[in-house]
UniProtKB/Swiss-Prot annotation:
GO terms for molecular function: sodium channel inhibitor activity; toxin activity. It comes from Tityus fasciolatus (Central Brazilian scorpion). SMART domains: Knot1. The modification Proline amide is found at P64. This is Alpha-toxin Tf3. Expressed by the venom gland. Transmembrane segments: none annotated. One of its GO terms (biological process) is defense response. Residues 2-63 form the LCN-type CS-alpha/beta domain.
């Protein structure tokens, strides 16, 4: 298992406007993580205990629409 920012296939993390911890916790659990929250500094969902195969944010740029 690993911790990190879950992403779609385009290396774009999930934004949590309004610092919605419940949204991020559900999103993370739907991805089989243990839990999650909205990291306010980046306004992005952060997950704890994601499966190793689940993609997480890398240093590359977000490329919307590229799967």
């Amino acid at each position: 298992k690993k911790d990190g920012y879950p992403v779609e296939g385009d290396n774009c993390a999930f934004v949590c406007f309004g610092y919605d911890n419940a949204y991020c916790d559900k999103l993370c659990k739907d991805k089989k993580a243990d839990s999650g929250y909205c990291y306010w500094v980046h306004i992005l969902c952060y997950c704890y205990g994601l499966p190793d195969k689940e993609p997480t944010k890398t240093n590359g740029r977000c490329k919307p629409g590229k799967k």
